[in-house]
């Protein structure tokens, strides 16, 4: 098992808790072994295609993985590469996205593809800062592109990873509300095994989706004996729920959906 990665310097005054190397290696070893047994065979994880990784990462934002694969398959069938997406009209892009939710994500993918055609010969750049400069690309999407698209080491942070790292290392029961974002980011960097990002990032994501749930399945947890939150859960404490999304009817989301339906129905315009 590679040694725990040293965290990068942070401008935040909130330090990450110290993780002794032996404990870090034990956490890595157990979670990677769990992942090897429970790996989800999502196509973008093995394709080594930066574009496919970007599509999957954008589709996964605020969307359950059970739906992401449907969105991904439909999208890749219509726009199999960056030039194909860049050449499409906005109405066509939104029609393919259909009712996947948050249609601004589709528009951002479209804009990013056009930037890549204009600046990078129809390919995604490898440099992290250049990736982050693409429309709609934030730190999580950039890390997924680096990890699955290029095979580079990059620490990803999503809601599942926040929950796993926050509980195991800091002992917070509901890290999304209790653990500072800077602490989670530093932990993600510190615990990333060198050369293993393409296994480690999805291991954390899948573990948070299947075992370290909002109501954790501690009896199934392979790192229970290493988890700082386990004694609190065992003592009867519970994680305070994260506030649910507001009602749909009459909301901004409802009106955005109606506006996007009008845009989907517009005649095609393939101009740039």
Outline where the language-model segments fall.
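Polybasic, lysine-enriched low-complexity intrinsically disordered terminal tails
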Residues: 1-15, 246
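Extreme N-terminal tail/first-helix region
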Residues: 11-31
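Catalytic cores of DNA base-excision repair glycosylases
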Residues: 29-30, 34-254, 262-272
